[in-house]
């Protein structure tokens, strides 16, 4: 079934493939603070549609495919049916803001990938189904809520440690946006989450 999750994946794959073939396009779309400071604010969005390599793209798109389809219906009643698309794009933008503020004058800072948006989708799913199994490395079953706790803890640790090209801060803020935006749009989700959390099912 064709849905907005599938549409986002198709667009992301096409743009990522084109950017790999065209270095000038890749450099124009990647998040680069000096360029943003010069008025290229669109990079807050465009960086989320390119990826470093095929594994980076595959991991993000597989995660988006499985969890996006599961939660997309919740947002369809908003913004003339485009609520999920807006939710996803806003997550990419908002997840990058803390990194931008931290690296505003850093001419060597670069960031790319859909991780902020994908994290928002993943955490919105966890809010709706906290005890649903998430398969770590595609084989190890772990309850969604435990995965969320470990994910946040690791993101904070890895961000403080540094030395990696992965934007762990964007993962964390994307996840936070996913939770907050979902509760704002549908406040009943919070009581559903609490009730589900208190009634674990394994």
Describe the predicted segments one by one.
Residues 1-202:
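A detector for small-residue-rich transmembrane helices and their helix-helix packing motifs
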């Amino acid at each position: 079934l064709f849905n907005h999750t599938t549409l986002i994946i198709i667009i992301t794959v096409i743009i990522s493939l084109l950017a790999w073939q065209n270095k000038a396009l890749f450099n124009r779309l990647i998040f680069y603070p000096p360029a943003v400071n010069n008025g290229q604010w669109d990079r807050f969005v465009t960086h989320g549609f390119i990826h470093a390599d095929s594994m980076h793209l595959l991991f993000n798109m597989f995660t988006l495919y499985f969890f996006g389809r599961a939660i997309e219906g919740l947002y369809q009643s908003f913004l003339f049916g485009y609520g999920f698309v807006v939710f996803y794009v806003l997550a990419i933008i908002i997840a990058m803001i803390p990194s931008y503020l931290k690296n505003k004058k850093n001419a060597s800072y670069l960031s790319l990938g859909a991780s902020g948006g994908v994290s928002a989708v993943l955490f919105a799913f966890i809010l709706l189904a906290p005890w649903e199994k998430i398969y770590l490395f595609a084989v190890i079953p772990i309850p969604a809520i435990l995965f969320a706790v470990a994910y946040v803890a690791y993101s904070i640790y890895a961000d403080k440690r540094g030395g990696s090209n992965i934007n762990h801060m964007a993962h964390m803020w994307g996840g936070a946006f996913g939770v907050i935006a979902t509760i704002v749009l549908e406040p009943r989700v919070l009581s559903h989450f609490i009730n589900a959390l208190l009634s674990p099912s394994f």
